[in-house]
Swiss-Prot record:
Keywords: DNA damage, DNA repair, DNA replication, DNA-binding, Viral DNA replication. InterPro entries: NA-bd_OB-fold, SBB_BPT7, SSB_T7. Belongs to the Teseptimavirus single-stranded DNA-binding protein family. One of its GO terms (molecular function) is single-stranded DNA binding. It comes from the Viruses. One of its GO terms (biological process) is DNA replication. The lineage of its organism: Viruses, Duplodnaviria, Heunggongvirae, Uroviricota, Caudoviricetes. The acidic C-terminus is involved in modulating the ssDNA binding properties. It is also required for dimer formation and for interactions with the viral DNA polymerase and the helicase. This is Single-stranded DNA-binding protein. Residues 213-232 are annotated as: Dimerization and interaction with the viral DNA polymerase and helicase. Residues 190-232 are annotated as: Disordered. Homodimer. Interacts (via C-terminus) with the viral DNA polymerase. Interacts with the viral helicase/primase. Part of the replicase complex that includes the DNA polymerase, the primase/helicase and the single-stranded DNA binding protein. Residues 190-200, 216-232 have a biased composition (Acidic residues). The gene is 2.5.
Length: 232
């Protein structure tokens, strides 16, 4: 919808879990039957429950889900879907939330976004480069492999979705951009194909290469940015 503004949130400082894909997308494994041609950027971020932002994130997600689910159920009851005679419509049901309490004083949040989309007019596939900034909020031109154990903050939006035959109604934590505060290149991350082949004393890439037109990464928890209907 023209002029629509989506609300963008900022997470607390957390630790990336293994198998993060932030410098390049995860395309799955087509040969094994779970390929993803659009590609996905993703990271599971674990925060301490003592961080006030952690509970605030949980509250925001739950509130968004409850409001969206209630509206969807009301619409379902007012206008039941038409199905073939003898079949029952799929009734509303809720799915898992995109976070879980680990039982050790931490909570893990699951963020992701597609790495490409199809232009509705030209049908052309357009790729999305996830913005990653350094601890000063400046854009990193060549994003390093970000492994499990890295310290991050993320900007994200909340995208509620309805139930279907595969999953129940829930909320997607749509990844918008990432702040890399402390880099842990190795440690089992999804991109760490050379993690077991380290050679000491050799060439090491610079930790952060910044663009000339450095952009500030604001800390506003409720920053509003234009929504792009064609991203997802």
């Amino acid at each position: 919808m023209a002029g629509f503004k989506k609300k963008v949130y900022t997470s607390g400082l957390g630790t990336a879990e293994p198998y993060a894909y932030l410098s390049k997308p995860d395309y799955g494994n087509e040969e094994r039957g779970f390929g993803n041609p659009r590609g996905v950027y993703k990271v599971d971020l674990t925060l301490s429950n003592k961080d006030p932002r952690c509970q605030a994130m949980v509250d925001e997600i739950v509130k968004t889900h409850e409001e969206a689910y209630a509206a969807a159920v009301e619409e379902f009851e007012a206008n039941p879907p038409q199905v073939q005679r003898g079949k029952k419509p799929l009734t509303p049901y809720e799915g898992d939330m995109p976070f879980f309490d680990n039982g050790d004083g931490t909570t893990t949040f699951k963020f992701k976004c597609y790495a490409s989309f199809q232009d509705k007019k030209t049908k052309e596939t357009k790729h999305i480069n996830l913005v990653v900034v350094d601890s000063k909020g400046k854009k990193i031109q060549e994003v390093p492999i970000i492994g499990g154990g890295s310290k991050l903050k993320v900007k994200y939006s909340l995208v509620p979705y309805k139930w279907n035959t595969a999953v129940g109604a829930s909320v997607k934590l749509q990844l918008e951009s990432v702040m890399l505060v402390e880099l842990a290149t190795f440690g089992g991350g999804g991109e760490d194909e050379w993690a077991d082949e380290v050679e000491d004393g050799g060439y090491t890439a610079s930790e952060s290469r910044q663009s000339r037109d450095e952009q500030e990464w604001q800390e506003d928890e409720h920053e509003e940015t234009p929504d792009d209907d064609e991203d997802f």
